[in-house]
């Protein structure tokens, strides 16, 4: 809805793919100075590989199954597929301020989701539970700042994400259960 030159871009794969394929494509396209990290926000969340191409562009690859809440997280923010992107289509989404941004033919409309949760849920196509969960997290973050994550492991470009994850699973039963 309110995409501009300084907007961040998150590219997400919704199914597991071998990470070496992404590394290969990046190398073929002369991306050399990118950062990678394994992230598991909470013990109940999926484990993902984040590849940061620059300050505004990230690629997310799930290394374990994405659950409904993880999938709806992307709808919440305004998920768009490649075909719609090529056609310059825009979709509604909710930002970190808890503002629903609805694209208009020219510009966009902004509306707080507070006390408008069911309207927001319908607009972005998620459950009311997802709206309430994201609202809880973002309001807590506003009050207390960003809290820690369960797993955050920076990777060198030489490390295989899958090999590091296997090693971490040997040391941690929660991670072990996720990858099995």
Which residues does each PLM region occupy?
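Catalytic core of pol beta-like nucleotidyltransferases
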Residues: 2-6, 15-180
């Amino acid at each position: 809805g309110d995409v501009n030159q300084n907007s961040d871009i998150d590219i997400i794969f919704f199914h597991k793919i071998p990470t070496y394929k992404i590394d290969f494509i990046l190398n073929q396209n002369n991306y050399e100075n990118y950062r990678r990290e394994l992230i598991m926000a909470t013990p109940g969340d999926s484990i993902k590989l984040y590849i940061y191409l620059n300050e505004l562009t990230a690629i997310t690859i799930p290394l374990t199954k994405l659950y409904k809440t993880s999938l709806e997280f992307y709808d919440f923010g305004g998920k768009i597929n490649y075909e719609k992107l090529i056609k310059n289509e825009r979709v509604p989404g909710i930002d970190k301020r808890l503002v629903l941004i609805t694209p208009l033919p020219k510009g966009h409309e902004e509306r707080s989701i507070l006390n408008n949760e069911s309207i927001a849920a319908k607009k972005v196509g998620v459950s009311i539970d997802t709206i309430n969960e994201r609202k809880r997290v973002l309001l807590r973050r506003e009050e207390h700042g960003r809290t820690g994550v369960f797993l955050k492991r920076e990777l060198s470009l030489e490390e295989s994400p899958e090999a590091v994850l296997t090693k971490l699973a040997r040391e941690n039963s929660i991670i072990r259960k996720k990858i099995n």
